[in-house]
């Protein structure tokens, strides 16, 4: 009887019982229950969902058998390295043709005038102009094939891409030139690559080229093509030294009248020769094939395919120099999927204005720009309460990010972060950073504040652009991800720095279809970079983390020995000191005849006055830069950061000089990718460095 009673109590109610129950409720109660049910249903269908990573985040790479410790990506087919993502896109020419096809002749290249909306060239317009320009080049004594090198000396703009595609359409090779190479390097490149034709944007660059010819330094240069208008005086000056000066439109018109059938390249054909800057001696010309470039961006696509699929609706903002492969690689992804590329006006100060007008979805950045964004955001939080609220909101968003949730519609976005997102156009869904190490603090904050996927990569021109990339779903910082599916990575002992592979540390080496073919006409330096087994020795020091990701811990290339015999890697030290709140830029200098380091510090003009005021030091920016009291406060803050980061005493600077003006591309102290040009910095601050050593002895 007891069992039957229990079963009777536990039985589910009949439908008639439920109906009777609801009829007994008041109308107000029923409406309230309905509203509650609707809210619950809405939350269930719209609650934020964590991104599912494409692999086990605790094992993002694996060792390759019988390879001497090399590791590979676990994403995709691990048995062979990825050479391409699409069968119909194995060269850069095919990449663009694929974009033309799938976009339905959609908008391709965008540009704008001040305070005007973007104007667009369609894919078909770009392809036609490229064919006409290429045909026109052939009419002016250029030859079809990879023996023909064409110089492009211009800032980012649609004509740059048209010129590049013109070369690819007829299997010619692009050689980018840029201002910061300096006249001597430009002369060296023109002669080394046997360049007879250079396409430039502005007349002053044409004049620079003519000056070399007039001094009989570049006898092979015969044709200079200008994108912008020029006067007859320039044309006449060219005639006098045997150089034909033509407008780009005239060459296109000539090609339209004498159209040639395209002669597309093969994957193994040379596509571009990128000459590096910022090193001692003559620049090195890294030879990259179409297959190199396609393999590299295919690796990127493979890693991100589960969470980020590029489409025709994607918009890329182009402001990083096209002369460097980081920008070229990201743009290739966009063209391959029929997306749009909008160019900045040419003034870095108007970036935010351009982004608001363009509303990009893809935004490649260098860490220095991320640092500036981070510093500016916190500088605007100018009271203790505002700063506390900002940090509180960031921590709440960062907790979501750690759980795999990436979104821009939370309550914290509405209250704090929407304005930050709007400054980038409000539609960014992917940020890619590379070219230098990024601060974990900055990356962690911006992943939360910007509400989009932020990836970090590592590589160099010699492996096309990237060789590692962070995995979707792994939003931790302090590493550069796992190997791309297009290459293997191994570490080798760096004896002079005391890094050993037995401890999971060593010089980073890369091998795969994205690795370059060597330096143009420079066998000695090619042998230094590429060993007999095809491994590229990067000169960077890395460490494998337990999850199979790579951490950059040092740099072999810029190390030097102090007088007492200790090796020092200045870039590692600079990456620590740059986190000092008032410091915008820093150059750490050492000498093998000296026993300690000194530094050149450029304070942040927006942050330093407030920071100084908190220390009880008053004055405007110029006055503060001359203040001995402030200099000591900044040095103390830097040394404290160094101690917290585990720097040895010999790695800490003992004296600093405060410099008012920023290092820049324009003053020749930064490369176009905003890396410090160490030889130039050393020479520029020679007097100040000598004084620092004399005072500190």
Curated annotation (Swiss-Prot):
EC number: 6.2.1.3, 6.2.1.15
PROSITE patterns: AMP_BINDING
Cofactor(s) annotated in UniProt: Mg(2+)
BP-aspect Gene Ontology terms: cellular response to insulin stimulus; fatty acid transport; long-chain fatty acid metabolic process; long-chain fatty-acyl-CoA biosynthetic process; neuroblast proliferation; neuron development; phospholipid biosynthetic process; positive regulation of long-chain fatty acid import across plasma membrane
Keyword Iron: no
Subcellular location(s) of the protein: Mitochondrion outer membrane; Peroxisome membrane; Microsome membrane; Endoplasmic reticulum membrane
Superkingdom of the source species: Eukaryota
Record topological domains on the Cytoplasmic side: 46-697
Catalytic activity: a long-chain fatty acid + ATP + CoA = a long-chain fatty acyl-CoA + AMP + diphosphate; (5Z,8Z,11Z,14Z)-eicosatetraenoate + ATP + CoA = (5Z,8Z,11Z,14Z)-eicosatetraenoyl-CoA + AMP + diphosphate; 15-hydroxy-(5Z,8Z,11Z,13E)-eicosatetraenoate + ATP + CoA = 15-hydroxy-(5Z,8Z,11Z,13E)-eicosatetraenoyl-CoA + AMP + diphosphate; 12-hydroxy-(5Z,8Z,10E,14Z)-eicosatetraenoate + ATP + CoA = 12-hydroxy-(5Z,8Z,10E,14Z)-eicosatetraenoyl-CoA + AMP + diphosphate
Protein name: Long-chain-fatty-acid--CoA ligase 6
Organism: Rattus norvegicus
Coiled-coil region(s): none
Organism classification: Eukaryota, Metazoa, Chordata, Craniata, Vertebrata
Gene Ontology CC: endoplasmic reticulum; endoplasmic reticulum membrane; membrane; mitochondrial outer membrane; peroxisomal membrane
Additional detail: 5 rat isozymes encoded by different genes have been described. ACSL6 corresponds to isozyme 2 (ACS2).
Family in the record: Belongs to the ATP-dependent AMP-binding enzyme family.
GO molecular function terms noted in the UniProt entry: arachidonate-CoA ligase activity; ATP binding; enzyme binding; long-chain fatty acid-CoA ligase activity; protein homodimerization activity
Tissues expressing this chain: Expressed predominantly in brain and, to a much lesser extent, in heart and adrenal.
Topology class, membrane: Single-pass type III membrane protein
Keyword Ion transport on entry: no
Transmembrane segments: 25-45
UniProt keyword terms in alphabetical order: ATP-binding, Endoplasmic reticulum, Fatty acid metabolism, Ligase, Lipid metabolism, Magnesium, Membrane, Microsome, Mitochondrion, Mitochondrion outer membrane, Nucleotide-binding, Peroxisome, Signal-anchor, Transmembrane, Transmembrane helix
Annotated function: Catalyzes the conversion of long-chain fatty acids to their active form acyl-CoA for both synthesis of cellular lipids, and degradation via beta-oxidation. Plays an important role in fatty acid metabolism in brain and the acyl-CoAs produced may be utilized exclusively for the synthesis of the brain lipid.
InterPro entries in the record: AMP-binding_CS (IPR020845), AMP-dep_synth/lig_dom (IPR000873), ANL_N_sf (IPR042099), LC-FACS_euk (IPR045311)
């Amino acid at each position: 009887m007891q069992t039957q009673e229990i079963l009777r109590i536990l039985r589910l109610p009949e439908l008639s019982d439920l109906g009777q129950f609801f009829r007994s409720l008041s109308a107000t109660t029923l409406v309230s229950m309905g509203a509650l049910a609707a809210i619950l249903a809405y939350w269930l269908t719209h609650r934020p969902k964590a991104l599912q990573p494409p692999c086990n985040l605790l094992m993002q790479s694996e060792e390759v058998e019988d390879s001497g410790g090399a590791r590979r990506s676990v994403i995709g087919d691990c048995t062979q390295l990825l050479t391409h993502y699409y069968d119909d896109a194995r060269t850069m020419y095919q990449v663009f043709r694929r974009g033309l096809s799938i976009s339905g002749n959609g908008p391709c290249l965008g540009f704008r005038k001040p305070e005007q909306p973007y104007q667009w060239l369609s894919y078909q317009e770009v392809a036609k102009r490229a064919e006409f320009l290429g045909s026109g080049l052939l009419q002016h004594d250029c030859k079809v094939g990879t023996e023909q090198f064409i110089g492009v000396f211009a800032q980012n703009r649609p004509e740059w891409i048209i010129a590049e595609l013109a070369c690819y359409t007829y299997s010619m090779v692009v050689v980018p030139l840029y201002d910061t190479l300096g006249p001597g390097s430009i002369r060296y490149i023109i002669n080394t690559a046997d360049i007879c034709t250079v396409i430039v944007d502005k007349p002053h660059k044409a004049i620079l080229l003519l000056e070399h010819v007039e001094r009989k330094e570049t006898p092979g240069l015969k044709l200079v093509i200008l994108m912008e208008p020029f006067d007859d005086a320039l044309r006449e000056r060219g005639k006098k030294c045997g150089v034909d000066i033509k407008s780009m439109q005239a060459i296109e018109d000539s090609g339209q009248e004498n159209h040639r059938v395209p002669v597309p390249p093969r994957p193994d054909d040379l596509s571009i020769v990128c000459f590096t800057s910022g090193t001692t001696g003559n620049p090195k010309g890294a030879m990259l094939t179409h297959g190199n470039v396609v393999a590299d961006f295919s690796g990127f696509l493979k890693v991100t395919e589960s969470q980020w699929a590029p489409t025709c609706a994607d918009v890329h903002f182009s402001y990083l120099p096209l002369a460097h492969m980081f920008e070229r690689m990201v743009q290739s992804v966009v063209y391959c999927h029929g997306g749009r590329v909008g160019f900045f006006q040419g003034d870095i100060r108007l970036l935010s204005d351009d982004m608001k007008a363009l509303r990009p979805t893809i935004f490649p950045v260098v860490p220095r720009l991320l640092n500036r964004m981070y510093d500016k955001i916190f500088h605007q939080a100018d009271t203790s309460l505002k700063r506390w609220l900002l940090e509180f909101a960031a921590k709440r968003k960062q907790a979501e990010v750690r759980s795999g949730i990436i979104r821009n519609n939370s309550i914290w976005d509405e209250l704090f972060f929407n304005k930050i997102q709007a400054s980038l156009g409000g539609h960014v869904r992917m940020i890619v950073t590379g070219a230098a190490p990024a601060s974990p603090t900055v990356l962690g904050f911006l992943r939360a504040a910007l509400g989009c996927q932020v990836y970090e990569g590592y590589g160099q021109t010699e492996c096309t652009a990237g060789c590692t990339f962070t995995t979707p779903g792994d939003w931790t910082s302090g590493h550069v991800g796992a190997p791309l599916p297009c290459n293997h990575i191994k570490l080798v002992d760096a004896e002079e720095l005391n890094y050993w592979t037995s401890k999971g540390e060593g010089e980073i080496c890369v091998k795969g279809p994205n690795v370059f073919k060597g330096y143009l006409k420079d066998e000695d330096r090619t042998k230094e970079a590429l060993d007999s087994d095809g491994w590229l020795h990067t000169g960077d020091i890395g460490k494998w983390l337990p999850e199979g990701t790579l951490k950059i811990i040092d740099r072999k290339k810029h190390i030097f020995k102090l007088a007492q015999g200790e090796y020092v890697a200045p870039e590692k030290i600079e990456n620590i000191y740059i986190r000092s709140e008032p410091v915008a830029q820093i150059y750490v200098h050492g000498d093998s005849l000296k026993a300690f380091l000194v530094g050149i510090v450029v304070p942040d003009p927006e942050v330093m006055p407030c920071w100084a005021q908190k220390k009880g030091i008053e004055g405007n920016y110029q006055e503060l830069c001359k203040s001995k009291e402030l200099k000591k406060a900044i040095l103390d803050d830097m040394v404290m950061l160094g101690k917290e980061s585990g720097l040895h005493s010999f790695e800490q600077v003992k004296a600093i000089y405060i410099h008012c003006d920023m290092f820049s591309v324009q003053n020749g102290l930064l490369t176009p990718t905003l890396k410090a040009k160490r030889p130039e910095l050393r020479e520029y601050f020679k007097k100040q460095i000598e004084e620092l050593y004399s005072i500190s002895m």
